[in-house]
UniProtKB/Swiss-Prot annotation:
Domain notes: The presence of a 'disulfide through disulfide knot' structurally defines this protein as a knottin. The cysteine framework is VI/VII (C-C-CC-C-C).
Family annotation (InterPro entries): Conotoxin (IPR004214)
Entry annotated with the keyword rRNA-binding: no
Species name: Conus textile (Cloth-of-gold cone)
Modified residues (4-carboxyglutamate): E56
Extent of the signal sequence: 1-19
Positions of post-translational Serine amide modification: S71
Disulfide-bond pairs as recorded: C48-C62, C55-C66, C61-C70
Processing after translation: Brominated at one of the Trp residues.
Protein's name according to its UniProt entry: Conotoxin Gla(2)-TxVI/B
């Protein structure tokens, strides 16, 4: 009976450490993807021209406010 309890405890510890490592890998992927998104946003802002230009979508404008022309 004691061996069974020890075996169950060892299995629980192994499962929890596996879940912990899997969570860390997921967080690294999220950090990596977020960094790329932040870099793309910085690039967009660098290429951002003045307001009152014609636009087709909010992403065309620095202010993200498009109504035929950018407004902000």
């Amino acid at each position: 009976m004691e061996k069974l309890i020890i075996l169950l405890l060892v299995a629980a510890v192994l499962m929890s450490t596996q879940a912990l490592f899997q969570e860390k890998r997921t967080m690294k992927k999220i950090d990596f993807l977020s960094k790329g998104k932040a870099d793309a946003e910085k690039q967009r802002k660098r290429n951002c021209s003045d307001d009152w230009q014609y636009c087709e979508s909010p992403s065309d404008c620095c202010s993200w406010d498009c109504d035929v022309v950018c407004s902000g």
